[in-house]
Amino acid sequence: MSYTLAAAYPSLGRHLPKLDLATLPTPATMHLLHLDTGSFEVAVKHDEATSNVYGGNKVRKLEFLLHRARDRGAQRIATFGAVGSNHALATAIHAADENLECTCFLSHQKGTPKIPFTLNMHRRIGTEIVPWGRGIEPLSLYREYLQGRNCWVIPLGGTCWLGSVGFINAGFELARQIADGAVPKPARIYIAAGTTGSVAGLVTGLAAARIDTEVHAIQVAD
């Protein structure tokens, strides 16, 4: 059983180059969950350990997206999110590590304790922050900040077919860990869902690796 789509399908993999930003495979461990209704075994895939730098499982997408940007000769990355967006900050940090400038279009969100940390990190690494969202005319904003700047745009949450390849790999990775006996084949998998690119990729990867299980997407953003 292969760990990645490229290993399983080499001819396809040659057309999907990526940067080495992630520490993979991430661990999969078993735990006993005690509830009033009884005790249950649950497996946990520790994708919080995907990057030693920052970003959790967002880095699975960024490996492919930032490689494509560099391959196309971009000098600046632009992406979108709320002011506390983990995706936006992860993109800015890893873009900076690849000597790419970054513009983040950030929209309002309800205050959380993490927002000051996130904004301070953006300032430390020199992210260009542009207010974005309701009441702002987007086309004029894009012309002002993107036109003529040799910019590569990464969609909200990194969700696009190329970003989802990172989670197709996650499906193959989990299938290999099941085959190796690290965890049993789960009856169902729960995954956080925002823009759902990770969900689409994981479902595709599990199907390609012939892991027959239910995938439940849990909404974490409005």
Q: Language-model features: where?
A:
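PLP-dependent amino-acid enzyme catalytic core
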Residues: 1-222
